[in-house]
């Protein structure tokens, strides 16, 4: 069985809003935000291009552990959800990765990859 991470490592708080639908103009409509405390948000900045035509893409991975966040179960229906970090920056969930325990089918953690 995998060991749960050190709580001192889980220092971030984010809010997540599941996308419900789109309005008549094509804008996303989101559910009520859920606050996730004691998660790990690893930010990533990627630069592409060269010279004066560089593009900066901000993304990252939010690590969620069910032994702390047992009220939410993540699956592919959370793709396109909106995450807001503690600085107010917003990201969109692009994939949900479920990590299982090594000896059982129980969920160890989820990785929410965001852009």
Q: Where would I find each of the regions flagged by the language model?
A:
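Short, conserved turn/kink motifs that form compact alpha/beta structural patches or helix kinks used as
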Residues: 18-22, 27-115
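Active-site-proximal polar cores
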Residues: 1-28
């Amino acid at each position: 069985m995998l060991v749960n991470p050190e709580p001192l490592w889980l220092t971030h708080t984010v809010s997540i809003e599941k996308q419900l639908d789109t309005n008549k103009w094509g804008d996303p409509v989101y559910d009520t935000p859920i606050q996730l405390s004691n998660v790990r948000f690893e930010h990533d900045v990627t630069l592409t291009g060269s010279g004066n035509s560089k593009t900066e893409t901000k993304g990252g991975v939010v690590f969620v552990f069910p032994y702390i966040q047992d009220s939410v179960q993540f699956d592919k229906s959370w793709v396109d959800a909106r995450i807001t970090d503690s600085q107010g920056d917003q990201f969109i969930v692009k994939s949900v990765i479920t990590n299982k325990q090594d000896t059982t089918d129980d969920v160890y953690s989820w990785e929410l990859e965001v852009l």
